[in-house]
A protein has these predicted regions:
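Helix-biased "structured C-terminal domain" signature
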Residues: 1-429
Length: 429
């Protein structure tokens, strides 16, 4: 795997066309770049499923029937605009294809044999089991972005922190370390040579028009999952977010789409590490009272507005996926549980998200939340890295590029229990 560098990448100025998602290329351009690649990754049957849900929020899906065993075969995404939904669905297929092991270079060794300065201690990945001394694992080289920081660079939040990360911010001299392949590939198969450290997952996977874009999306997901895991463990959702009249029209319109269809939405700003905001959304379809439509969505972004929009879009995507029957075979037991529990009981079981006590929690206006996002992807990455330096000794990026830029971001110590309940951090945050 090649050494990762961070170079200058300006975001497109077509925010109005794309709704909210400012990439280095517009969503329309991105979709056109991605479409010819679908044959290369075995993706077929790209179509729209917007009409399955009364919301009318654009949703597209594409199938990848030859995905590795244990990997996702259906890739569904929603968007503010059709172009955004198309690009997100196609990019998701590329992301998951890229995460599958395809004769990538690996080392087979023990942590002790590789050396403490050359490899990450697997225990820092919040393992569900103890690691035997001398236990042999598969390892891959990954780039540690934190190693490229100038030690004189102030942290974000200090007087000079934000200004020190300029549009010319780059990282070109980062160190490499070995990290367990189990944390990189998904699905992960130890090929009969080693035991799994944990069940592999998709947390921290990202793809984009550029490596920087892929890293930003992956980095955001890792921070989001850390915040969501901590919130679920502590049962503290932070502050309820109010979408006030000063919020951008695109966000107000999106929220109104749910409300006019008889769907209640609650938004929270979860306690998160570093700059930016993790927004969680809970969707209560009190019109149909369908327990399967009690869904949540969450997203982290430097821009609070973008985080809120992405959380709502994830709710729309999950509703459409369930209506499309994507989980029917995989989660037959869960479907049966939902049917037996019913709407009211399921709300009580998930009272943290849907309980009446939430009405009494502290609130904040979306327009009053700090927005340190910039017009440059590289600068946004720099701001995030600078702001989490107290929480993250390492930020690893493994290059998974196959047909277009794709990465896996791994931040040791960041929580993951919302994805894998067996991996619970035992120390305080």
């Amino acid at each position: 795997m090649s050494v990762i560098t961070i170079n200058k990448v300006k975001k497109t100025d077509t925010a109005a066309e794309d709704g909210y998602c400012r990439r280095s290329k517009s969503s329309g351009e991105t979709a056109e770049i991605l479409k010819p690649l679908m044959q290369d990754i075995g993706a077929i049957d790209f179509f729209e499923i917007t009409s399955l849900d009364r919301l009318g929020i654009p949703v597209y899906t594409i199938a990848r029937p030859r995905a590795a065993w244990g990997g996702a075969r259906i890739h569904t995404a929603a968007g503010v605009t059709p172009a955004d939904a198309k690009a997100a669905s196609l990019m998701s297929a590329v992301e998951r294809f890229s995460s599958e092991y395809r004769n990538d270079a690996m080392e087979f060794s023990s942590y002790e044999r590789l050396g403490l300065t050359r490899a990450l201690d697997p225990a820092e990945l919040i393992l569900p089991r103890s690691l035997e001394i001398g236990e042999e694992l598969h390892w891959v080289l990954a780039t540690d972005l934190m190693s490229g920081f100038d030690t004189d660079t102030p942290e974000y939040g200090t007087d000079r922190g934000a200004e020190s990360i300029t549009e010319d911010f780059t990282l070109t001299d980062c160190a490499e370390m070995y990290i367990p392949a189990n944390a990189v590939f998904h699905p992960y198969d130890p090929l009969g040579m080693a035991q799994q450290l944990f069940r592999s997952d998709s947390n921290g996977l990202g793809a984009g028009n550029t490596t920087e874009e892929a890293i930003y999306h992956a980095l955001c997901e890792v921070i989001e999952r850390d915040a969501l895991s901590a919130a679920e463990k502590s049962r503290n959702l932070g502050k309820k977010v109010i979408i006030d009249d000063n919020a951008p029209q695109v966000l107000r319109n999106l929220l109104a789409t749910f409300e006019k269809n008889g769907i209640g939405i609650n938004l929270w700003s979860l306690p998160s590490k570093g700059a930016g905001v993790t927004v969680a959304a809970a969707c209560d379809d009190y019109t149909t009272r369908d327990p399967a439509m009690l869904v949540t969505g969450s997203a982290y972004d430097l821009s609070p507005v973008n985080a809120a929009i992405k959380a709502l879009i994830e709710v729309a995507q999950r509703r459409a996926s369930r209506l499309n029957g994507e989980y029917a075979d995989k989660n037959a037991d869960q479907k049966s549980l939902l049917e037996r529990a019913g709407y009211d009981r399921l709300k009580r079981i998930n009272s943290m998200w849907f309980g009446s006590a939430n009405a009494e929690c502290d609130t904040c206006r979306i327009s009053e939340l700090p927005d340190p996002s910039t017009d440059y992807v590289n600068r946004d990455i720099g701001i995030i890295l600078s702001s989490i330096r107290d929480s993250a000794e390492y930020v690893f990026v493994a290059d998974l590029t196959k047909v277009m830029p794709a990465v896996r971001v791994v931040i040791p110590g960041f929580e993951i229990s919302c994805v894998d309940p067996s991996r619970v951090k035992k120390t305080n945050r």
